[in-house]
């Protein structure tokens, strides 16, 4: 998927996303977060496009985080990461050179689990990669969604958390099962795409919006740009700053920036990495009407 098709895909599902704040002034331009650090007490950092691109850390960001902490700032990761257990994610961040307490990493996976409700004994069909294991999910009655149509027919609901092993054939089975018998669909990663070293990967949000378009089943989304993940992040901040002194930092207008507006906090769009690394953020801002407070070249 290209930048243009990814942007168009997000624009096509705006009716399922929170509305932007209208009438915002043009964003300020800054070189790095250091230039605006004095205005904020807490920084919520996206992962892909801010901390890393795929499996590669963005140079200088670990040092920036250290500098912010030395200034007394609270720094959390707020990421639409759902495909890996929390412990595996912590191992990844450590491997990339980042030092975070597990409680300071707020993910869409954690958000889904914190909000999971329904009748006792529900059996869930799971969109995930078996190789990542079921840590964090041990208390749920799960079956992997693979090639057996019976699994899709028999479960009480569906959890979409990882799409690396997902196929068009499995998507067709899921859509057919929902058309035959509508059930709950919970999405642990609303991202449509994520920036990788070689381009964009397709994420669970892509398939969730597709099935909504084709079946009429409205998925329940957990993660940016929806309020649930920001509520979890706010609960971690101690002391809780005024909302205009909290800055969400991300590379995506439709998740990071839109979600920050919905949460009533400020936002900084990273223009030099991630979604807009090879594109024009100003044109996208004008077209979408999603306006960050600040555009930074790099974190």
Name each model feature, range by range:
Residues 75-78:
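Short glycine-rich or small-residue beta-strand-to-loop segments that form or flank ligand, phosphate
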Residues 49:
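Receiver (REC) domain active-site loop signature in two-component systems and cognate sites
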Residues 81:
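Conserved phosphate/oxyanion-binding catalytic-loop motifs
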